[in-house]
A protein has these predicted regions:
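Terminal amphipathic alpha-helical/low-complexity segments used for targeting or macromolecular assembly
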Residues: 1-76
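Left-handed beta-helix
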Residues: 76, 82, 87-88, 93-96, ...
Length: 182
C-alpha cells in the first residue's frame, strides 16, 4: 500500500464522514449529532475513516491505530483494517462481527450484514490475495468472501455462504462452497 493510494487529506476525511452522516439519515445538525453518538453502523465507518486518515498521515500517527482498532472491536467485535479501501454509502445492516482484511476493496453502495468476513485465502506458500466487492453488492449474514476474487456489481451473497470464486454481475451465490444460482 502506498501513501498516495487514496490521497486522503483531513478535508477529504471530514467530507466523507459528513457524507456518511447524511447517508445514515442526518438531515440536520440535531439528527447528525444523534447519529454520531448513537448509530453503531455509522460509528463503524467513522472509526474506519479516522484510522485510514491516521494511517496515511504519518508513522507517529499510526500509534493511535491501536486505540481505534480496539474501539472497532468493542463496537460489536468488528475489525476493519485501515489498509482496506472502502467506498461511500457502505451500509452495515447489523454491525456485529464484521471482519475486513488489509487488502480488501469494497466499492460504493454495498450492504454488509453481521458476522461476515472478507479476507485472504490463508495459504502460507502463496502471496496474500484479497477480494474486491463491486458497487451495489449485498453480502448477507455469516458469509465468508475469501481470496483474490471479485463479487461483481449488484451480486448477492447468500447467508452463511463461503465464496471462493468470482460472482458475476447481477447474480446470486449460495452454499459451502458457494455456487452461482442466477
Amino acid at each position: 500500500l502506498k501513501k498516495n493510494d487514496f490521497n486522503y487529506s483531513l478535508k477529504n476525511c471530514l467530507k466523507d464522514i459528513n457524507q456518511d452522516l447524511v447517508f445514515y439519515g442526518g438531515k440536520n445538525l440535531l439528527s447528525k449529532v444523534i447519529i454520531f453518538f448513537l448509530n453503531i453502523s455509522f460509528k463503524l465507518i467513522f472509526w474506519y475513516r479516522i484510522s485510514r486518515y491516521r494511517y496515511l498521515k504519518s508513522k507517529m500517527a499510526r500509534k493511535a491505530l491501536i486505540f481505534i482498532k480496539y474501539r472497532l472491536y468493542v463496537l460489536g467485535g468488528n475489525e476493519i483494517d485501515y489498509r482496506a479501501k472502502l467506498g461511500k454509502e457502505i451500509k452495515f445492516a447489523h454491525p456485529s462481527g464484521v471482519i475486513i482484511g488489509a487488502g480488501v476493496v469494497i466499492e460504493d453502495k454495498v450492504t454488509i450484514f453481521q458476522q461476515t468476513t472478507f479476507g485472504s485465502h490463508g495459504h502460507k506458500d502463496e502471496p496474500k490475495s484479497y477480494p474486491t466487492i463491486k458497487q451495489g453488492a449485498i453480502i448477507y449474514s455469516g458469509a465468508k468472501v475469501i481470496g483474490g476474487i471479485t463479487v461483481h456489481e449488484n451480486a448477492v451473497i447468500g447467508a452463511n455462504s463461503v465464496v471462493l470464486i468470482d460472482v458475476p454481475k447481477n447474480s446470486t451465490a449460495v452454499g459451502i462452497p458457494a455456487k452461482i444460482i442466477e
